[in-house]
């Protein structure tokens, strides 16, 4: 969210020049202790945008905690899969994962976060919320409520033995967008490759992939 200098000047009854000096100091302090990034937008309609972050120390502790949870023997499912639903449905854990992923892409000028329905949606939403950008949902089945869509075929399955189709509403993504793909699961990479193909159809650019 962009907050204008006028807002600060009126609230604290200070000159905008003084506010600007304070922002420089605060920006430096926030980056030093790794709690967030302050972006300054110049011009008549300018102001500042604060993007929260997480310190390297806190991120490491959270990752270790997640690793311990994921290592629990009762999480192993038939086929070698790992049960994740309880973690991805816990708001505090989901928020922290979103902050950790977003931290790695904070300087990448992300315009949107993309995921595929349905289990990747909460995670993508958490990342998009920290980056303060929209998130778009790719679907494997066509829904009339999506309006006009763009579709691509992609190879599904670790053995590459199935051809499936995915859809994205034409209104979901602007041409030229830099997009971060986020998903909760990776097997053969077919779904991610399908989303990358969709980005090409929208003349958009892949900024990164986080799984």
Predicted segment positions?
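Short alpha-helical "recognition helix" segments of helix-turn-helix
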Residues: 4, 8-12
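PRPP/pyrophosphate-binding module of the type I phosphoribosyltransferase fold
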Residues: 12, 22, 27, 32, ...
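The short coil/loop that forms the "turn" connecting the two helices of the helix-turn-helix
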Residues: 13-14, 133
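Key DNA-contact positions within bacterial/archaeal DNA-binding proteins
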Residues: 17-18
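Minor-groove-contacting beta-hairpin "wing" of winged helix-turn-helix DNA-binding domains
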Residues: 36-51
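Active-site-facing substrate-recognition patch
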Residues: 49-109
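Short glycine-rich phosphate-binding loop at a beta-alpha junction
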Residues: 110-117
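Short, glycine/charge-rich flexible loops or terminal/linker lids adjacent to PRPP-binding catalytic cores
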Residues: 133-179
């Amino acid at each position: 969210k962009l907050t204008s200098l006028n807002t600060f000047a009126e609230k604290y009854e200070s000159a905008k020049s003084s506010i600007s000096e304070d922002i420089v100091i605060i920006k430096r302090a926030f980056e030093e202790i790794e709690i967030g990034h302050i972006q300054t937008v110049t011009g008549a309609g300018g102001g500042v945008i604060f993007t929260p972050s997480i310190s390297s120390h806190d991120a490491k502790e959270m990752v270790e905690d997640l690793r311990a949870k994921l290592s629990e023997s009762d999480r192993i499912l038939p086929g070698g899969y790992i049960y994740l639903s309880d973690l991805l449905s816990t708001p505090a854990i989901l928020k922290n994962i979103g902050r950790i992923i977003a931290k790695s892409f904070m300087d990448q000028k992300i315009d949107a976060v993309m995921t595929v329905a349905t289990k990747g949606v909460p995670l993508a939403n958490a990342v998009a919320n920290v980056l303060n950008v929209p998130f778009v949902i790719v679907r494997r089945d066509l829904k009339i409520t999506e309006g006009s869509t763009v579709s691509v075929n992609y190879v599904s399955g670790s053995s590459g033995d199935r051809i499936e189709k995915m859809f994205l509403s034409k209104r979901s993504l602007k041409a030229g967008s830099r997009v971060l793909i986020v998903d909760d699961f990776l097997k053969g990479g077919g779904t991610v490759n399908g989303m990358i193909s969709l980005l090409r159809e929208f003349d958009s650019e892949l900024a990164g992939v986080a799984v």
